């Protein structure tokens, strides 16, 4: 388990480090603390390749990239939750979480609460599964791009108008 944690901490360091603001954010020192704590600079951490970086490279468009980033941020929030009682790294994790919160959720506490609610939902609960399936059609409709939805409604209205006039 510790090896996995070390590897994940290294990935966090790399992800945040290569995000374009390496060394400029308040999290730089805290990432170094986590790297030391998890021994994430050890060469064996690189075994198997990167965890997230290759995936991030595959997603070019900003809106698409946000989808992947949300999953990655969710992962790190869960990782930090697993170590919440570890006083040695608590300050570092809090600072990094706050920086992620500012960057990813634009500092919106409402968005943060919603995000936390989503990552806490247990998928093995039957009642949750039933609710999720019940809401699936609405969720799928919400996934449709808004412009396509308007185009489809417009073309349906045109088609109906032609049918009525013949």
UniProtKB/Swiss-Prot annotation:
One of its GO terms (cellular component) is extracellular space. One of its GO terms (biological process) is humoral immune response. InterPro entries: 4_helix_cytokine-like_core, Interferon_gamma. It holds the Pfam family IFN-gamma. It is found in: Secreted. Gene3D superfamilies: 1.20.1250.10. Glycans are attached at residues 39, 106. One of its GO terms (molecular function) is cytokine activity. Residues 1-23 form the signal peptide. Transmembrane segments: none annotated. Keywords: Antiviral defense, Cytokine, Glycoprotein, Growth regulation, Pyrrolidone carboxylic acid, Secreted, Signal. Released primarily from activated T lymphocytes. The modification Pyrrolidone carboxylic acid is found at residue 24. The keyword tRNA-binding does not apply. Homodimer. Interacts with IFNGR1 (via extracellular domain); this interaction promotes IFNGR1 dimerization. Type II interferon produced by immune cells such as T-cells and NK cells that plays crucial roles in antimicrobial, antiviral, and antitumor responses by activating effector immune cells and enhancing antigen presentation. Primarily signals through the JAK-STAT pathway after interaction with its receptor IFNGR1 to affect gene regulation. Upon IFNG binding, IFNGR1 intracellular domain opens out to allow association of downstream signaling components JAK2, JAK1 and STAT1, leading to STAT1 activation, nuclear translocation and transcription of IFNG-regulated genes. Belongs to the type II (or gamma) interferon family. This is Interferon gamma.
């Amino acid at each position: 388990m510790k090896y996995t944690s070390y590897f994940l901490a290294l990935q966090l360091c790399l992800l945040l480090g290569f995000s374009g603001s390496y060394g400029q954010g308040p999290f730089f020192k805290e990432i170094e603390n986590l790297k030391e704590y998890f021994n994430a600079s050890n060469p064996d951490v690189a075994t198997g390749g990167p965890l997230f970086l290759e995936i991030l490279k595959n997603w070019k468009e900003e809106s698409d990239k946000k989808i992947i980033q949300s999953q990655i941020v969710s992962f790190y929030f869960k990782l930090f939750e697993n170590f919440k009682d570890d006083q040695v790294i608590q300050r570092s994790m809090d600072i990094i979480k706050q920086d992620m919160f500012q960057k990813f959720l634009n500092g919106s506490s409402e968005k943060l609460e919603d995000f936390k609610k989503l990552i806490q939902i247990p998928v093995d609960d039957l009642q949750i599964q039933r609710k999720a399936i019940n809401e699936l059609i609405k969720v799928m409709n919400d996934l449709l791009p808004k412009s396509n939805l308007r185009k489809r409604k417009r073309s349906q209205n045109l088609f109906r108008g032609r049918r009525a006039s013949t």
